[in-house]
Amino acid sequence: MAEIIGIDLGTTNSCVAVMEGGKVRVIENAEGSRTTPSIVAYTKDGEVLVGASAKRQAVTNADRTLYAIKRLIGRRFDDNVVQKDIKMVPYKIIKADNGDAWVEVKDKEGKSQKLAPPQISAQVLIKMKKTAEDYLGHEVKDAVITVPAYFNDSQRQATKDAGKIAGLNVKRIINEPTAAALAYGMDKKKGDRKIAVYDLGGGTFDISIIEIAEVDGEHQFEVLATNGDTFLGGEDFDLRLIDYLAGEFKKDEGVDLHNDPLALQRLKEAAEKAKIELSSSQQTDVNLPYITADASGPKHLNIRLTRAKLESLVEDLVERTIEPCKVAIKDAGLKVSEIDDVILVGGQTRMPKVQEAVKNFFGKEARKDVNPDEAVAIGAAIQGAVLSGEVKDVLLLDVTPLSLGIETLGGVMTKLIEKNTTIPTKANQVFSTADDNQTAVTVHVLQGEREMASANKSLGRFDLSDIPPAPRGVPQIEVTFDIDANGILHVSAKDKATGKEQSIVIKASSGLSDEEVEKMVKDAEAHRDSDRKFHELVDARNQADAMIHAAEKSVKDLGSEVSADEKSAIEKAVNELKEAMKGNDKDAIEAKTKALTEHSSKLAERVYAKKGGAAGAPPGGEAEGEPQAQAGGKKEDVVDAEFEEVKDEKKKDEDK
């Protein structure tokens, strides 16, 4: 069976891994990094940039550079957390027709295009898919994608949609802390252990209590409880620092940088860099020359920042992570002292203040043998290997993070499945009508812990009609909730008297319709085709440039030996090629390049002969001859060096 890759689709960074020959390999991207910034940029030329290239141009293209999109996935525009984010990001968050939070960017014609968060996240997944394909040498179709444990049903569904848009068959959605536990526990076979996975990433916080046990020779990972906050992460730490720096600058210079998207983007980059530096040093300088200007001239920002100051700015954010830890321990039915190991996941856990808070709560140092940036992708790859059958002795028992139920008489939520129930699971309950002769009931599906229905997350609603008229309380309506292994909910309602049944797979009451997802899949495929054509055009231009350089160099080297006719023909061919390069017609550029090659090939041979090519080139002659060899089309003389990558595992064996 083909490999199933593991993807950690993160708020700030993403990572991809695959299991090969029993070992998990985290795959480097085209830039040589093991993690890729989860940033997507739409340039003024219509190109889509993903990762480091998108991050590099963020300052000059702030309103089209989209980051932390995971915080919007599966969210309503009117959510308080979304409203808070709108004020802090340089790009435009809008209300979609279905009430979701979407993003608006300008296309290359300057027209507004509306993008759904799954559509943007799909671009990051396409990059991860391509990274894996480049390494494996063949197409990849199947993937396991991770989500925060505390993601609700609509956020999970939106993540699955993103995978589909990216051309991936999402075999499983698994929780990030569970994946990290797999990465940690796979090679630890002795005895039962209870571990706490504290996952503070770029945009979300999760805590999971997991028991690792040996059961009948199987390595069993059972999630006992999970809790968290899907709008608390490193981005919030950055925002505190940005606000502080902007406030200090306003005090000194009287200018509010929040009103300047360009300055705000530079400030964001500087704040992130300063935060990282303060994890290893006690103080740092934030120095941004020419950050803005007013009538009196340019303004420069130069502020000294200490670790103590940063810690005071984010103290309450660190404290906010402790309450979910208390709830998770209580829900797991354990005491803090019964936790054997604490695993830290997510880049923000590198902050000493966070590590100190974790140590104070759990009464022990966290493990340092898990890479916080890579553990989740490694765990996803292990789960992929379990699903493909490559790994056979692992059983993963995950849970649903929030209770699920329906709205009943008086606006009350009646729970059918309690939080922290092991999935997959199924539950049913019989309800009845509230009025005499009622012929239809509306099943309103809810997710959350509050008694009042309106205070919980609405996942969707559907009607069961054609109920035979009867006094209230007589009809028997059986409602069944079925959660699959991805944590996605299927609900059905059945009239026991008539056998009539109505069911839905819960998509968020917002969410993308199947038609919208299919359209986005086609758009993404079309974009991949246009990207391929763009790269082919760039290659053609590069070859044309090299040909022009080689031809002009040949004319210069031969000097008076070039006849007027030859010179005129080459100049004409060069000018025609330069004209073709101004356009976007790849075929025209290639045709003119070929014409110039034919004109200049004889000159190239004469240059080579003149420099001693015929009588044996002097030292250095080969290097000088390279462009001419190209120009003359003598490719058979140039042999590409063949090499193969030595895999880490082989290398280790050789070193022994």
From Swiss-Prot:
Membrane topology label: Peripheral membrane protein
Matching entries from InterPro entries are given as: ATPase_NBD, Chaperone_DnaK, Heat_shock_70_CS, HSP70_C_sf, HSP70_peptide-bd_sf, Hsp_70_fam
Q: Which residue ranges have biased composition labelled Basic and acidic residues?
A: 647-656
One example of a Gene Ontology biological process annotation: protein refolding
Q: According to the record, what induces this protein's expression?
A: By heat shock and acidic conditions.
The record's subcellular locations are:
Cytoplasm; Cell membrane
- Keyword Lipoprotein listed? The answer is no
Q: Which UniProt keywords apply?
A: ATP-binding, Cell membrane, Chaperone, Cytoplasm, Membrane, Nucleotide-binding, Phosphoprotein, Stress response
Low complexity compositional bias: what residue ranges?
A: 620-632
Q: What is its main location?
A: cytoplasm
What is one cellular component GO term in this UniProt entry? cytosol
Tell me the segments the record calls region Disordered: 607-656
User: Where are the Phosphothreonine modifications?
Assistant: 204
Task: Please give the superkingdom of this protein's source.
Answer: Bacteria
Q: Please name the GO terms that the record assigns under molecular function.
A: ATP binding; ATP hydrolysis activity; ATP-dependent protein folding chaperone; heat shock protein binding; protein folding chaperone; unfolded protein binding
Family, per the entry? Belongs to the heat shock protein 70 family.
Which PANTHER family did the record assign? HEAT SHOCK PROTEIN 70KDA
So what does this one do?
Answer: Acts as a chaperone. Might have a role in the infectious process.
Which protein is depicted? Chaperone protein DnaK
Q: Which organism is it from?
A: Coxiella burnetii (strain RSA 493 / Nine Mile phase I)
Phylogenetic placement of the source organism: Bacteria, Pseudomonadati, Pseudomonadota, Gammaproteobacteria, Legionellales
| Encoding gene, per UniProt annotation | dnaK
